[in-house]
Regions:
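Membrane-interfacial amphipathic/re-entrant helices at transmembrane-helix boundaries
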Residues: 1-19, 47, 58-61, 88-93, ...
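Membrane-embedded helix boundary and interhelical linker motif in transport proteins
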Residues: 7, 29-76, 260-267
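Short, non-helical or kinked segments that cap or interrupt transmembrane helices
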Residues: 25-45, 59, 90-93, 167-170, ...
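Transmembrane helix-bundle core of multi-pass membrane transporters
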Residues: 84, 92-164, 263-274, 299-317
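Cytosolic-side transmembrane-helix boundaries in multi-pass membrane proteins
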Residues: 176-183, 187-190, 261-317
Length: 317
């Protein structure tokens, strides 16, 4: 059996992959870096926590509600902020800054919500350890299986949606060439709305899952926003599939890498865990700015085959 830190690391990495994918989907369609992703993730945790405390059962059964709530937050952001700015052809900087304002508003509502939970429902929501409510399956936390299954199932579902449905094909066309898509009659605004629904839903779903591995607080999302963006950038800002891979790699490197370093150099290193995704993000931007999806994988595989013994030269008879 894998060590507990590796199991938690894989769970954490799967959640980061989902959130990084949400960032990329929104950016690909609207060219907006969604900094509200952080607090959307926190809201996903609180939806799961409150439903579990009020209605019981297992925390995982409320993950779909977290997704739906995040999708609603995405719809509000699109109609209230993003669409008016897109219609005015706002710059990417303006679009990004507008999401920071939305993030502040969401964070304020979380603080109010936590006060309500404390004084009216007698809950203690400002420091929650959701792992205490875990269900064990064959000696392994159930969140491990859920995170791993979703990290595989969502890319498959996303691929089927984008390639096998009429709206998915229209969405791809709009992302690749918005002007041409409008000319042939595709409603770009529906595509933008769909991207915010998917992106917001993935943010809150990822937040609900990641709370099973870290302490849930009102600022939980702000503690992992660097990791989310590092995963999105490593995977490639123009590839939803790449962002899933990038998010998983960054999340696993941060969680397990920090533990390995702390085991050798001391626990004081745990306070610097954000350095790992920062280094990965900086290295990615310097070495391959288009991310993993932009690498010439065909040429790399051909070069690897050529370097193998007996593959680089033809044997003459």
């Amino acid at each position: 059996m894998l060590p507990p830190v590796v199991l938690s690391g894989i769970t954490y990495a799967g959640a980061i992959a989902l959130m990084a994918c949400g960032i990329t989907i929104i950016y690909m369609s609207t060219r907006t870096f969604n900094f509200a992703h952080a607090t959307m993730a926190t809201w996903g945790f609180y939806i799961t926590y409150v439903c579990y405390m009020l209605y019981g059962g297992a925390p995982y059964q409320y993950f779909p509600l977290s997704f739906l709530f995040g999708a609603m937050l995405g719809v509000i952001c699109y109609f209230g902020i993003n669409r008016p700015l897109l219609r005015r052809e706002a710059s990417p900087i303006t679009l990004m800054m507008s999401t920071m304002g939305y993030d502040i508003a969401l964070l304020a509502t979380i603080q109010i919500f936590c006060d309500y939970l404390t004084y009216k429902l007698r809950l203690y929501p400002r420091r929650v350890i959701m792992s205490t409510y875990e269900t064990m399956v064959w000696g392994v936390p159930a969140s491990f299986f859920i995170s791993l299954i979703l990290a595989v199932a969502i890319p498959v579902a996303l691929h089927m949606f984008l390639t096998m449905t009429k709206f998915g094909v229209a969405m791809r066309a709009t992302i690749e060439n918005p002007t041409l898509a409008n000319i042939i009659g595709i409603d770009a605004e529906k595509v933008y709305l769909a991207s915010w629904i998917i992106g917001g839903g993935l943010a809150s779903l990822g937040g609900a899952i990641v709370s099973m591995t870290i302490t849930g607080t009102p600022v939980m999302g702000n503690m992992i926003i660097v990791t989310m963006f590092a995963g999105s950038i490593l995977g490639g800002l123009y590839s939803a599939y790449g962002s899933l891979l990038g998010g998983f790699v960054v999340g696993l490197a941060e969680y397990v890498g920090t533990w390995l370093l702390a085991s050798y150099w001391g626990g004081w290193l745990l306070g610097y865990r954000m350095v790992i995704p920062l280094i990965i993000m900086a290295g990615s931007l310097l070495v391959f700015p288009e991310g993993l999806a932009g690498l010439p994988w065909g040429a790399l595989l051909a070069a690897l085959k050529g370097a193998l013994p007996g593959k680089g030269k033809e044997v003459s008879s």
